[in-house]
Amino acid sequence: MMDVEVLSEREFEGGWSFELRLGDGDDVTRTLRLSWADYDLWSNDGGDPPHAVAAAVAVFLLSRITASDLPATLDAATARRRYPDADEKIPKLIRR
């Protein structure tokens, strides 16, 4: 499994933006946006730190595609749109 490190977190109107380092030897940096709506969907009780949800989304996406194939900036909802099992699997990947 590829390592995901949250380098920075920034809140904006409607959600958060995270700079992530995705690495397994060749480090790749990507920006992931997480809306409040997607956070509420994946953090069932709302008790998870937003950065943990963002990291879980990245881990999920990396189980499907390579880090270099991810766009430089992406929205977390991309996981839901592309992969029907995202809503089931992402909450299980959140590290508490």
Question: Which positions does each model-derived feature cover?
Answer:
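Short, charged/polar N-terminal "headpieces" of proteins
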Residues: M1-V28
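Domain-level signature for proteins that mediate thiol-based redox and metal-cofactor handling
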Residues: E5-E9, L32, D48, K92
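Intrinsically disordered, low-complexity linear regions
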Residues: G23-T29, A67, K89
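Short acidic, glycine/tyrosine-flanked loop/strand segments centered on an H-E-D-like triad
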Residues: G25-W42
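Acidic, low-complexity intrinsically disordered segments
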Residues: G46-R96
